[in-house]
Regions:
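N-terminal redox-cofactor-binding region of secreted/periplasmic oxidoreductases
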Residues: 3, 7-194
Length: 194
C-alpha cells in the first residue's frame, strides 16, 4: 500500500489533474475554455493538434494564402467526404482547420453561425431548445461585433467579430455583377437573412 501511495503521489505531481479537458481549439473550443476558466477554481486544459494561428498564411487573408491553407496538411486535416450518388460518386475535399482557431483559421476567418432554418429544423425533429430563437442569445452573449449592437448582434462579448480589411477587386467585381444581375446582396449573413 505504501508503494501504491508513492506511485500515486508521483503521478499526481508529474501529471496535473484538470476539471475540464477540451479537445480542439477551434472557435467553440476556445470560447468554452475561456468561459470555464473564468472561474478561478476550474483547471482547464485546451488541446489542439495543429500549430499556432500566428502565421502570415492565416493572418493575411488573400486568395493565394487560402489556397495554400486548403492544401496544407500542417493547417488542414485533409478530410474527404464519402462518395455519394448525387455527387457522381466523387469524394469531395472537406477542409477542416488544424490550428488554433480551427476552421475559422482556414476559411478566411469568417464567422458564420449557421442558417436559422437549420436550428429550427433540429428543434422540429425533437431537439428542444435548439431552435434559432433559443440559441441566438448564446451567440449574442459571446459576440463583440464591430458594427455595433442590434437584434442579431452584440457589442460587449469576449469574441471580436470584425469585417475584413482585405479587398480583392475580382471578388468585389463579381459581387457587384451579381447585384446588377438581380441577385439579392447581403452584407450581414449572420443577420435576419443568410
Amino acid at each position: 500500500p505504501a508503494f501504491v501511495g508513492i506511485l500515486l503521489r508521483t503521478f499526481l505531481t508529474r501529471f496535473p489533474m484538470y476539471d475540464y479537458i477540451i479537445v480542439g481549439a477551434g472557435s467553440a473550443g476556445c470560447l468554452l475554455a475561456n468561459r470555464l476558466s473564468a472561474d478561478a477554481n476550474n483547471r482547464v486544459l485546451l488541446l489542439e493538434a495543429g500549430p499556432s494561428d500566428h502565421t502570415h498564411w492565416i493572418r493575411k487573408t488573400n486568395p493565394l494564402n487560402m489556397l495554400v491553407l486548403m492544401q496544407s496538411r500542417k493547417f488542414n486535416w485533409g478530410y474527404r467526404c464519402e462518395p455519394e450518388a448525387a455527387t457522381g460518386n466523387r469524394p469531395f475535399f472537406w477542409p477542416r482547420g488544424k490550428a488554433l482557431g480551427g476552421c475559422s483559421s482556414v476559411n478566411a476567418m469568417i464567422y458564420a453561425r449557421g442558417h436559422q432554418w437549420d436550428f429550427d429544423h433540429w428543434a422540429a425533429l425533437g431537439n428542444q431548445g435548439w431552435d434559432y430563437a433559443s440559441v441566438l442569445p448564446y451567440f449574442l452573449k459571446h459576440e463583440r461585433q464591430q458594427r455595433g449592437k442590434s437584434a442579431f448582434h452584440n457589442d460587449a462579448g469576449t469574441m471580436d467579430v470584425v469585417d475584413t480589411n482585405f479587398h480583392f477587386p475580382p471578388s468585389e467585381a463579381f459581387v457587384k455583377a451579381c447585384g446588377e444581375a438581380g441577385f439579392a446582396l447581403n452584407d450581414d449573413f449572420n443577420g435576419a437573412e443568410q
